Amino acid sequence: MGLSGKNVIFVGGLGFIGYEACKQLMAKNMASFFVFDVLDKPEDIKALQALNPKTKVYYTKFDITSKQSIKSALADVVSKVKYIDALINGAGILTDLNVELTMNINLIGLINTTLEALPLMDKNKQGRGGVIVNIASVLGLEPCPPAAVYCASKFGVMGFSRSIGDPYYYNITGVAVVTFCPGLTETPLKNNIGSKYTFEYSKKISEELNNTKTQKPEVCGAHLAQVVESHENGGIYISNQGTLAKVTPTVYWQPTYH
């Protein structure tokens, strides 16, 4: 799905990977670009707008842990431009010391945002179809002992995305669901692995993981922008050490209705 002339929302667009992806997306000649974030960075929004005057950039102060904030922000988009064509769910934290906050931001907030946006995008309701890209992690595909809580939240994102990305739903709504899994990337989130791990026992392996080779956020952001345009329902992609690769998950069980 080309993004030219489309209306796009990026939740968490002012983070490191998110902002790099935003810069890439601004080259796509979108009609409008809505950046939802708890961070307030007016200079970054101005810089985005300067990249392409053809795309109208909006900033919305956004609390992903609040259903009312989610509902109000999405309603504002529809009131301004009528249609939502693409939603990127990119808000996330890594702090295993706070289980509730990790789950509320990384998983529950993502679920609530998706479920609120989907009817607005559904071609049989208010929308014209589109794509939802949920940002999980390589730690949503494989376990990571020093970040067990973060890992659980991202496994949840993976399970949710694969479930609502079933062809049954896509054929009805016209909304594709794609999952994007960054590997270790040079961001403050990655640095938290070395200090906000699950147990005290985790310190040694956390430090070892923190010293693993990483990729630049610019590279990961470019990969994310590429995945948004793929519009491949059910697609799962890993961005790791500078390479973007599609993932085919192992299937151990299938529901009988398939």
Curated annotation (Swiss-Prot):
SUPFAM superfamilies: NAD(P)-binding Rossmann-fold domains. The keyword Transport does not apply. It comes from the Eukaryota. Pfam families: adh_short (PF00106). It catalyses: a primary alcohol + NAD(+) = an aldehyde + NADH + H(+); a secondary alcohol + NAD(+) = a ketone + NADH + H(+). Homodimer. This is Alcohol dehydrogenase 2. It comes from Ceratitis cosyra. The gene is ADH2.
